[in-house]
């Protein structure tokens, strides 16, 4: 059984809050995170680059890193 990389829950809450505050529509950002997580999950099955991070956590990290480009948060 593989161990998952442990994230600090306060860090994940901070990233989520940061992403929600930057979005104009909460529903659309939740859908975008879900789609990104699904894509990340399928990419990790093929590439197996870092199976220790859950797909939703990786999606949140990637999307908060992309906050400097606001056009990525729109549909």
Swiss-Prot record:
Gene Ontology terms, cellular component aspect? Answer: DNA-directed RNA polymerase complex
Say yes or no: keyword Transmembrane present.
no
Recorded GO MF terms: DNA binding; DNA-directed RNA polymerase activity
Sorted alphabetically, which keywords does the UniProt record give?
DNA-directed RNA polymerase, Nucleotidyltransferase, Transcription, Transferase
Task: Tell me which SMART domains the record gives.
Answer: RNA_pol_Rpb6
Q: Which reaction does it catalyse?
A: RNA(n) + a ribonucleoside 5'-triphosphate = RNA(n+1) + diphosphate
Give the protein's biological function.
Promotes RNA polymerase assembly. Latches the N- and C-terminal regions of the beta' subunit thereby facilitating its interaction with the beta and alpha subunits.
| Record's subunit section | In cyanobacteria the RNAP catalytic core is composed of 2 alpha, 1 beta, 1 beta', 1 gamma and 1 omega subunit. When a sigma factor is associated with the core the holoenzyme is formed, which can initiate transcription.
Family note = Belongs to the RNA polymerase subunit omega family.
Report the protein name in the record.
DNA-directed RNA polymerase subunit omega
What species is given as this protein's source?
A: Microcystis aeruginosa (strain NIES-843 / IAM M-2473)
């Amino acid at each position: 059984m593989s161990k998952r990389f442990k994230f600090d829950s306060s860090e994940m809450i901070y990233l989520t809050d940061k992403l929600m505050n930057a979005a104009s529509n909460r529903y659309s950002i939740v859908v975008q995170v879900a789609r990104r997580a699904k894509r990340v999950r399928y990419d990790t099955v093929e590439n197996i680059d870092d199976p220790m991070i859950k797909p939703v956590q990786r999606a949140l990290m990637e999307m908060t890193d992309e906050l400097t480009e606001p056009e990525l948060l729109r549909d």
